[in-house]
């Protein structure tokens, strides 16, 4: 359950505040389109953080990076909740993502450390399910909070969720990477492998294709609040339902995709 919460924190942080973007824009005195830049600001931190947490956790263990990331996440969430400057909000969102992505990276690594391959496959399936369900529920939860309080409460909620993860990590998780399996190579050597991957056509062609697909989804996430709520006059509550249906379709088609893949021979 702790792993599930660590995984869920990323999708919750992306999608939960989307219904609040128009009211945030009004508070800051800017256009909703400009306030939507807080979405790609988050993705910047998400991309950069994942490049480093993996090698770092392989070197010093899993728990320490997990604590550092979660503390950073809580601090950044509080900054989002209290700032009165839109640019500080954008920076805070990037820092929030740098903290949140530790849950995805380190939780996967801890599962690989602990479980047999068959159990690991089941655990990863549950993680994918959590990552699919969280975007469905997050906008609805955000719109419910908007009914009773301002948009700032959403970020206070996320800060509280981060604190809960820290407490649960302290109570129920322990170090899973023993000293004998730690990677003590210099960090430069580890990071140079990223460059080797970029030169490998068997990797980068599929990666480019997947990146374009994911990029289109992120563009939709950034543009949807202004397009749907302001363009069509949809309320935040109705927007959360529309967004949830999109997320449900994404999850459903991901499951359907398992059927043709099972009949396809993949080249090693």
Model-derived features: where do they sit?
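Cytoplasmic helix-loop-helix junction between adjacent transmembrane helices
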Residues: 94-129
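Juxtamembrane intracellular "pre-TM" segments in multi-pass secondary transporters
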Residues: 178-205
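Conserved small/polar residues in nucleotide/adenosyl-binding loops
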Residues: 2-6, 264-268
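Paired small-residue
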Residues: 76, 87-95
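Helix-loop-helix hairpin linking two adjacent transmembrane segments in secondary transporters
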Residues: 126-170
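Extracytoplasmic
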Residues: 5-25, 221-225
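Extracellular/periplasmic helix-loop-helix junction of adjacent transmembrane segments
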Residues: 20-47
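Conserved MFS/SLC helix-loop-helix module at the cytosolic interface between two early adjacent transmembrane helices
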Residues: 48-82
